[in-house]
Amino acid sequence: MKALILAGGFGTRLRPLSCTRPKMMFPIANRPLLDWVIEGLSKKGVTKAVLAVNYMADVIKKNFGTSRYGVKIAYSHEKMPLGTGGPIKEAEQLLNENEDSFFVLNGDILSSIDYSKLYEVHKALGAEATIALREVEDPSRFGVVEINGNNQILRFVEKPKIEEAPSKLINAGVYVLNQSVFDIIPSGKKVSIEREIFPILASKRSLFGNRFNGLWIDIGKPQDYITANKLILEEIANEKPFLGKNVKMSSKAKIIPPVAIGSGARIAEDTLIGPYSSIGDNVTVSKGSRIQGSIIFPKAWVDSFASIKDAIIGEGAILGHWVKIEDQCIIGDHAIINDNVTLTQKVQVCPSKEVDTSVLQASTVM
């Protein structure tokens, strides 16, 4: 089986972190998001993944090369942003070998979807396209379907007002498509598969859905990213911390799982790490500091008696003595937060910016 992973997005809602890396390279439990996606595909029989890349494509290529977990990797490079449908047409030559159906995945979705089961359902239904469906309380952020008793999708409505949604079943960002779908996607232009292609298939009565339960999260906003990290930590490190190589940790440090600590990290005495925290490779956490519910990118420095809660700290950032950062604040790569500064209420600090006064309401420090 083959899969196309849409990996070209700009990740604008995750700035400033996405200013310096593509979203697919964001670490979750100290592994890139894309690594988790490809591993999940490999476990369900996918043998080839085509990555539709655009923004910072070279970073992805350098890190993933031509194979991972036994899955061969090829690249389809968009010369300009082509939406969610255009990349499918662009990758046609890489996907039209042998099999008559293939997967398409939104690359920023983390899920436990059983790909092999979805493929079997698609074949059994005789569908031209099958969408994995997920029930949510608020469908207004997503594509919403109206479905009949035969799992046939009658209508597809992209991001409706909540009172106008035909159901609470949303497009989970994973599809099985037949080769015939290539024929209805125009070449060389920006196309929305949700707004332009799925309605055509629904009108032909060849679009079906398959509901699933289990892990599913769309990593679109900072809180979603923090939540995804927590969910994966629960799976891999719920009873004891997941440690990389050559971690130097004081016997007087307190670790509350689930926690992941990367290779070469240094954890000093009287620190409290966890629960639900990822400490990246070569991070230093100094005496008396506390890190809870947060993601610390590699090579960051956390000085003594700092407090970090529900925040994201970029690569190489430096946090001074008695710094307090909480409530979904994002610190860009190589930023410097000076001693005694407090940041709260979703403050965003741009890369390499130095902050020497507290900011207590939502804003961007540029």
State where each predicted segment sits.
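N-terminal nucleotide-binding beta1-loop-alpha1 segment
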Residues: 1-19
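Conserved N-terminal catalytic core of the sugar/cofactor nucleotidyltransferase
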Residues: 2-5, 27, 31-106, 110-117, ...
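A structural signal for short hydrophobic beta-strand segments in well-ordered beta-sheet cores
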Residues: 25, 144-147, 198, 209
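Glycine-rich phosphate-binding loop at the start of an alpha helix
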Residues: 35, 85, 89, 194, ...
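Catalytic-core segments of class I nucleotidyltransferases/pyrophosphorylases
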Residues: 102-103, 110, 116-123, 136-139, ...
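A short, conserved acidic/glycine-rich loop-to-beta-strand motif
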Residues: 125-135
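Extended, small-residue-rich solenoid/repeat segments and analogous flexible loops
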Residues: 189, 202-293, 299
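Glycine-rich hexapeptide-repeat left-handed beta-helix
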Residues: 286-366
